[in-house]
Amino acid sequence: MKKLGKIKHIVCALGAFVLIASCTDNYKEWNTNPTEVPEDMLVGLMKIGNFFPTMEMDVIPTSDVDANQFQRSQNLCGDMHSGYMTPIGTWGSSSACHYNLRYDKWNDVAFKVAFTNVMPAWKQIHDNGREEFPEAYAVAQILKVATMHRVTDIYGPLPYLQFGHGGLETPYDSQEEIYKSFFVDLDAAIDELQDYISVHPGSKPLNKYDLVYGGDFTKWLKFANSLKLRLAMRTSYVDGFEVNGKTSQQLAEEAVKEGVITENAENALLQSGNGISVFHPLKICWDNYSDVRMGADIESIMKGYSDPRLAKYFQESEYGEAGDKFHGARLGVNVTDKKNYIKLSSPSIYADTPVQWMCAAEIYFLRAEGKFRGWNMGGEVEELYKAGITKSFEQWGAALGDYLTRGDAYKPVRFTAPSGTLGTVAAVSAITITWNENDSDEKKLERIITQKWIAMFPEGQEAWSEYRRTGYPKLFDLYGTNASSGQVEKSGPRRLPFPSTEYDTNTTEVNKAVSTFLGGNDYGNVKLWWDNK
């Protein structure tokens, strides 16, 4: 976590804009070529356009040149608690790596980035573009949900629904109310984009600002429906959940019917464009800082499956013989000297690797789980499960071979810590790859989620959320010192405590939230509203 001064990172400035009055009418009244964007609309969009990359750059915190925000909010949080990666920084045995979740205020960062970067940019678009450019505002709403569902899934309740309304302190909302607002916002955005696309197919008014889909509203529409499906599944263990009379099942079925991501060309990926360089911050974490290596959990599972994607996800270590070069570390090892741990496998994520928000494989696995639950997902469970695996292999350019039909010999294996490192432990799961309709329901669910977890790499925040929701994949307990003072089990935290800054500046409201929504304890062992299995 040092300042990285040598990396040149072109960011989008939010300097003064000349507010040029637009003379465009509503897009439905254009009397022009429907595939083109009128010049006066493009000029008008200058008022709000640069706020879109500001939002996009911090859905997953990517905007700071030294990657400190990403490291503390993502890599030392979801990437770690999901089992994908293990930090090897020399922070001692009382850090967040050992479940001291308030260590060095790491727990403040995800909240800070969302409420000082993303939400103010959204507010600018809301105030200056909602009426004049409803189709652009729809994308801003989708970006807001894409960001804030990650944040509420870290902390739980948030001061969210009254953001920007003024006042010295902002009240917190329950996670249930926040989630309900997500579905309302997504449905409104979906309707708006559908209307726009029906009148102006192929038009891309946000092309010069959008770093994810290049202004392609058809892809934004699929992403919105896919996000709706993801969030509907997140509520699957909440009894009686409804939004405007619609159950989790109905919300999920609507999303699939309206059209979700089905191809890798539709994956939500943040990447360089329009004069803005997106430098993947994970590369800084593993290379410049040498603070992270492969996790023992992903080694155990993928080695047991002889999964060819392992060589796509990680680099060979300096340990082992030919054919056995991928080695990781247990979460919780007390690293006092990096010299042995630095030789372990690093993520194969480089400066120009796009930052993944969502992939087609995840959506197929969501649909497989939905069908497993009896929902109409446009296919059968086995078909969708296999499609998820296939799409993941295609995404990473790995050969599928006989992977889908591998027998019982292919299952997670013992983790053996290389010489000079610690944490050897037996495998904690025996789940296999091949779909078996005769298996128990719980075994079927474990199989779906384990493969989904593999496919979502390296997006650890979503993997951690799904681990908390389902209990899968089965992960190793924390190795070594548990520094949580009894506030977190060795199986991992369920949330992060609220930021210290909230106790300093929003004192009354954060204390009220702890009392009302968390049972009086702002601890890491308090389950979120949807963590109800």
Say what each PLM segment does.
Residues 23-83, 124, 473, 485-533:
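Membrane-proximal, proline-rich intrinsically disordered regions
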Residues 67-71, 313-316, 460-469:
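Short coil/turn segments at secondary-structure boundaries
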Residues 42, 86-143, 147-402, 437-446, ...:
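Structured, solvent-exposed acidic/aromatic patches
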Residues 31, 344-346, 424-429:
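Short acidic (Asp/Glu) and glycine-rich catalytic loops that position anionic groups and cofactors
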Residues 1-21:
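Sec-dependent bacterial lipoprotein signal peptides
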Residues 397-533:
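C-terminal functional modules
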Residues 17, 58, 62, 391:
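Phosphate/oxyanion-binding loops and surfaces in catalytic or ligand/nucleic-acid-binding neighborhoods
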